[in-house]
Amino acid sequence: MNDRIYIEAARAALARAAWVRGEAPAYNEDAISDLLADLRHLCAATDLDFSRCDRVAAMHFQDELGGVS
């Protein structure tokens, strides 16, 4: 996959989260923070380890950048 697909997936997640809340879509730091908080709530409710998910996501991100840190 390429960056465009990753970015579109993230934008779609932000738009859907805003829609569920009855808000206009936003693509700024506040919107990203809200979505991350929503994901923390989901992890807590379903007994998933958010910190582990975040670490794995960071590894995936580095791999997708070609291992550049």
Describe each model-derived feature in a short phrase.
Residues 1-30:
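N-terminal acidic leader/helix
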Residues 12, 42, 66-68:
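Short amphipathic alpha-helical "recognition" segments used for binding
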Residues 19-26, 41, 45, 63:
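General structural signal for alpha-helix termini and helix-helix connectors
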